[in-house]
């Protein structure tokens, strides 16, 4: 069975990351793909489903998982709630040949690279700051104050783009989606990947 690849996907709010992930999962059935479901200690919001949006656990349960070193990465955010990525769940899905995407920020990405050096990371850039602000306003979800905070945070996040393996400017949604698909395809054609997947064939070809 083919081994799946682990990907980090990061972007400032408004760059189109969530829409791209949804479109990517719905396209090209030649490879299995999924987004990792995180654990959190916060209460479920209306419409959120256990195991689909998050795994909702108590603070005590979360801290027990930390002590057992069962998180690939985790963080305690403003308000005191924990968020984390389960290591056993990731390993299980990768072993099934599923490409797993981690929708996390640059800080989480730094944690994961230390534990999984083979992870591939992708950063989505907006075409410009004015366009990013226009998209945030167009969503109609946030106040002017919150949008200003998101814009300030976006500049900080963008400054870490050079820590990533791939960088894509989301100026044209369909083109960006094709770029993401190309990355997935090319990563399954690397020498390291093929040596693992076709070890027996290579051994047979070199037997004489």
From Swiss-Prot:
First and last residue of the signal peptide? none
Instruction: Report if keyword ATP-binding is assigned.
Output: yes
Under the heading Pfam families, the entry gives: Guanylate_kin
Q: Which InterPro entries match?
A: GK/Ca_channel_bsu (IPR008145), Guanylate_kin-like_dom (IPR008144), Guanylate_kinase (IPR017665), Guanylate_kinase_CS (IPR020590), P-loop_NTPase (IPR027417)
Q: Look up the domain of life of the source.
A: Bacteria
Q: Where in the cell is it found?
A: Cytoplasm
Write down the chemical reaction(s) this protein catalyses.
Answer: GMP + ATP = GDP + ADP
In this protein, which residues make up the domain named Guanylate kinase-like? Answer: 4-185
Q: Which family does it belong to?
A: Belongs to the guanylate kinase family.
Summarizing the function annotation, the protein's role is: Essential for recycling GMP and indirectly, cGMP.
Q: What is this protein called?
A: Guanylate kinase
**Species of the source:** Haemophilus influenzae (strain 86-028NP)
């Amino acid at each position: 069975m083919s081994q799946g690849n682990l990907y980090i996907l990061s972007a400032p709010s408004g760059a189109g990351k969530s829409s791209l992930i949804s479109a990517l999962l719905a396209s090209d059935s030649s490879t299995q793909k999924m987004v990792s479901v995180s654990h959190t200690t916060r209460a479920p919001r209306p419409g959120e489903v256990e195991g689909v949006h998050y795994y909702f656990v108590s603070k005590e349960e979360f801290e027990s998982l930390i002590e057992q070193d069962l998180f690939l990465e985790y963080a305690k955010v403003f308000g005191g709630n924990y968020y984390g990525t389960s290591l056993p769940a990731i390993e299980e899905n990768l072993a099934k040949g599923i490409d797993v995407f981690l929708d996390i920020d640059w800080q989480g990405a730094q944690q994961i690279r230390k534990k999984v050096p083979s992870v591939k990371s992708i950063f989505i850039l907006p075409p410009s700051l004015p366009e990013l602000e226009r998209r945030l306003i167009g969503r109609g979800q946030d106040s002017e104050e919150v949008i200003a905070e998101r814009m300030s945070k976006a500049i900080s996040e963008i400054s870490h783009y050079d820590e990533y393996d791939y960088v894509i400017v989301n100026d044209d949604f369909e083109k960006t989606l094709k770029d993401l698909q190309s990355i997935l395809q090319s990563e399954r054609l690397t020498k390291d990947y093929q040596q693992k997947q076709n070890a027996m064939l290579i051994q047979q070809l070199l037997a004489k």
